[in-house]
């Protein structure tokens, strides 16, 4: 429709330009008409490629914008995932610390119980060893005294005196 109107105006302009009342010395009118026709044809021929180039540029810009927005969205999702992961790791760290504290307390109690059992066993062993040594010493002292008495023939003691001597030595 626009082309049709354009050609009508061009032909109307040409028909008025062909009027005999105009001075024929000037060719400015014909040059203007030729320029308008040339410009119209040039516009008609170049309009499509320029429009296509412009649309292609718009499409490239919009595709880049979409790619950037997609990357931005992915970055935000990664950021949120990282935040969530960080919170999970923090929670696990707190749980691990609590578990480590409980294990340390349990290990400490276990070591203390083991040490107390070892101490009790050592005390019992010491008491038994002490008891054994006391009995051994009593026997050796008694044997020594008796050997002295029996080896000395000059000493004549009664049985009661011997028992008293042994008791004094032992105690």
UniProtKB/Swiss-Prot annotation:
The keyword S-adenosyl-L-methionine does not apply. The chain crosses the membrane at residues 3-23. It holds the Pfam family ATP-synt_B. GO terms for molecular function: proton-transporting ATP synthase activity, rotational mechanism. It comes from the Bacteria. It is a single-pass membrane protein. GO terms for cellular component: plasma membrane; proton-transporting ATP synthase complex. It is found in: Cell inner membrane. Keywords: ATP synthesis, Cell inner membrane, Cell membrane, CF(0), Hydrogen ion transport, Ion transport, Membrane, Transmembrane, Transmembrane helix, Transport. InterPro entries: ATP_synth_b/b'su_bac/chlpt. F-type ATPases have 2 components, F(1) - the catalytic core - and F(0) - the membrane proton channel. F(1) has five subunits: alpha(3), beta(3), gamma(1), delta(1), epsilon(1). F(0) has three main subunits: a(1), b(2) and c(10-14). The alpha and beta chains form an alternating ring which encloses part of the gamma chain. F(1) is attached to F(0) by a central stalk formed by the gamma and epsilon chains, while a peripheral stalk is formed by the delta and b chains. Belongs to the ATPase B chain family. HAMAP family: ATP_synth_b_bprime. F(1)F(0) ATP synthase produces ATP from ADP in the presence of a proton or sodium gradient. F-type ATPases consist of two structural domains, F(1) containing the extramembraneous catalytic core and F(0) containing the membrane proton channel, linked together by a central stalk and a peripheral stalk. During catalysis, ATP synthesis in the catalytic domain of F(1) is coupled via a rotary mechanism of the central stalk subunits to proton translocation. This is ATP synthase subunit b. It comes from Campylobacter hominis (strain ATCC BAA-381 / DSM 21671 / CCUG 45161 / LMG 19568 / NCTC 13146 / CH001A). The lineage of its organism: Bacteria, Pseudomonadati, Campylobacterota, Epsilonproteobacteria, Campylobacterales. The gene is atpF.
């Amino acid at each position: 429709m626009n082309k049709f109107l354009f050609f009508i105006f061009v032909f109307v302009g040409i028909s008025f330009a062909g009027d005999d009342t105009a001075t024929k010395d000037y060719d400015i009118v014909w040059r203007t008409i030729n320029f308008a026709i040339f410009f119209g044809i040039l516009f008609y021929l170049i309009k499509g490629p320029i429009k296509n180039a412009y649309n292609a540029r718009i499409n490239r810009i919009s595709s880049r914008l979409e790619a950037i927005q997609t990357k931005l969205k992915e970055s935000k999702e990664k950021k949120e995932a990282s935040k969530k992961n960080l919170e999970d790791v923090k929670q696990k760290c707190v749980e691990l610390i609590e578990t480590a504290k409980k294990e340390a307390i349990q290990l400490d109690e276990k070591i203390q119980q083991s040490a107390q059992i070892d101490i009790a066993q050592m005390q019992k062993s010491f008491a038994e060893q002490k008891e054994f040594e006391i009995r051994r010493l009593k026997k050796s002292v008694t044997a020594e005294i008796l050997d002295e008495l029996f080896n000395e023939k000059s000493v004549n003691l009664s049985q009661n005196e011997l028992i008293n001597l042994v008791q004094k030595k032992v105690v």
